[in-house]
């Protein structure tokens, strides 16, 4: 991890991307389950 100076580490990008994807999927399923999926 000594070569990540000035750049974002790849594991941070992967973690953030994973959280965002899981959050979007969760909101989509929660919205469709609550009957609000059409408003998205």
Curated annotation (Swiss-Prot):
The UniProt entry, under Pfam families, shows: PsbJ
Q: Which UniProt keywords apply?
A: Chloroplast, Membrane, Photosynthesis, Photosystem II, Plastid, Reaction center, Thylakoid, Transmembrane, Transmembrane helix
Q: Where are the transmembrane segments?
A: 8-28
By its UniProt entry, which InterPro entries does this protein fall under?
PSII_PsbJ, PSII_PsbJ_sf
Which ranges form a coiled coil? none
Q: Where in the cell is it found?
A: Plastid, Chloroplast thylakoid membrane
Q: Which Gene Ontology terms describe the biological processes this protein takes part in? A: photosynthesis
Instruction: Write down any Gene Ontology CC term.
Output: photosystem II reaction center
Q: Tell me its family.
A: Belongs to the PsbJ family.
Q: Which HAMAP family match?
A: PSII_PsbJ
What this chain does, per the record? One of the components of the core complex of photosystem II (PSII). PSII is a light-driven water:plastoquinone oxidoreductase that uses light energy to abstract electrons from H(2)O, generating O(2) and a proton gradient subsequently used for ATP formation. It consists of a core antenna complex that captures photons, and an electron transfer chain that converts photonic excitation into a charge separation.
- Protein name, UniProt field: Photosystem II reaction center protein J
**UniProt gene name:** psbJ
